[in-house]
């Protein structure tokens, strides 16, 4: 099977959400879903808001990134999470 690399864009609910805590939570979530976190970064958006990007590496399987994406969307301080890039290695 091939290895999948995905870039997930995560939007926090507000500028008051602690950036470092959110990044740590996202990394832990990825690793608890049989995947590897290859990096977490943030970029300023506007008016104090920021976007968090999570690079995920996992083995190709049925359902793919859906369980991880759904778990990220279920987090309390996350407004939305979506896969913005996906490639096979």
From Swiss-Prot:
Leader sequence residues? none
Gene Ontology molecular function, alphabetical: translation elongation factor activity
Keywords (alphabetical) are:
Elongation factor, Protein biosynthesis
- InterPro entries associated with the record: eEF-1beta-like_sf, EF1B_bsu/dsu_GNE, Transl_elong_EF1B/ribsomal_bS6, Transl_elong_EF1B_B_arc
Q: Establish whether keyword Protein biosynthesis is in the entry.
A: yes
**Phosphoprotein is among the record's keywords:** no
Annotated Pfam families:
EF1_GNE
Q: What does this protein do?
A: Promotes the exchange of GDP for GTP in EF-1-alpha/GDP, thus allowing the regeneration of EF-1-alpha/GTP that could then be used to form the ternary complex EF-1-alpha/GTP/AAtRNA.
The record's comment on protein family reads: Belongs to the EF-1-beta/EF-1-delta family.
Q: What is this protein called?
A: Elongation factor 1-beta
State the organism named in the record. Answer: Methanococcus maripaludis (strain C7 / ATCC BAA-1331)
Which gene does this sequence derive from?
A: ef1b
